[in-house]
Amino acid sequence: MDKITIPNEILIPEVGRLLAEGREVEMRPKGNSMLPFIRQEKDNVVLKKKDKVDKGDIVLVDLGGRYVLHRIIAEDGERLTLMGDGNVRGTESCTKDKVLGTVVKIVRPGGKSVTPSKGKLWKALLPVRRYLLAFYRRVWTKI
């Protein structure tokens, strides 16, 4: 089967529309910012619009035409702070109304589905995350 790549500026608004209608959407995210839990070119995510988002949720957000799929690491009223699991620093901020959907399932190759964790342990490992990610990228992915 041929692979079709649709630019985010076309795809994501349509995904947002489907999610707003109450539908679930399965898509394959691009980029390595959610390694090691969501792997580019291997994993798909299933998104759903939820009434309430919580710290630890992985969300798809619209940052003014730039779209990211990152984890909520802090919540202050209507304001959210996001960070990719594969990042060692650098965060994004947005308001809750910019959340298009929440990852409810990660689909691995072969069709096995896993429910995403809240990432509490991974957040606690932030001081050593750079070393864990280096090991993952240099060694684990080669196995």
Predicted feature locations:
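Extended hydrophobic leader/signal-anchor segments used for secretion and membrane insertion
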Residues: 1-143
